[in-house]
Amino acid sequence: MSIKPLGDRVVIKRLEAEETTKSGIIVTGTAKERPQEAEVVAVGPGAIVDGKRTEMEVKIGDKVLYSKYAGTEVKFEGEEYTILRQDDILAIVE
């Protein structure tokens, strides 16, 4: 079984943020900022605009930066994912 997003939605898996600051201070779970970098694990077929399906700009495997509070967090088969709209993705990291 897998997650298949609909429309212009994208499923991402967050990449872990640094756990130590530059000065060597270890950051606990509650103090950590939500990471904004993730890997795309599934892509919807694209939104329908004026009767035509739009092409998705991201693909599976892309590393992306996304809006800090975007999307819906879901747990699937023991893993945590975020489902968001393609518009919430700010950039592809190359």
From Swiss-Prot:
Spans through the membrane: none
CDD domains in the cross-refs: cpn10
GO cellular component, one term: cytoplasm
Protein name: Co-chaperonin GroES
GO BP field: chaperone cofactor-dependent protein refolding
UniProt cross-references to InterPro entries, sorted A to Z: Chaperonin_GroES, Chaperonin_GroES_sf, Chaprnonin_Cpn10_CS, GroES-like_sf
Function according to Swiss-Prot or TrEMBL: Together with the chaperonin GroEL, plays an essential role in assisting protein folding. The GroEL-GroES system forms a nano-cage that allows encapsulation of the non-native substrate proteins and provides a physical environment optimized to promote and accelerate protein folding. GroES binds to the apical surface of the GroEL ring, thereby capping the opening of the GroEL channel.
Subcellular location: Cytoplasm
Similarity comment text for this entry: Belongs to the GroES chaperonin family.
Gene that this sequence comes from: groES
NCBIfam families: PRK00364.1-6, PRK00364.2-2, PRK00364.2-4, PRK00364.2-5
GO MF term set: ATP binding; metal ion binding; protein folding chaperone; protein-folding chaperone binding; unfolded protein binding
Main location as per UniProt: cytoplasm
Assembly information from the UniProt record: Heptamer of 7 subunits arranged in a ring. Interacts with the chaperonin GroEL.
Record keywords: Chaperone, Cytoplasm
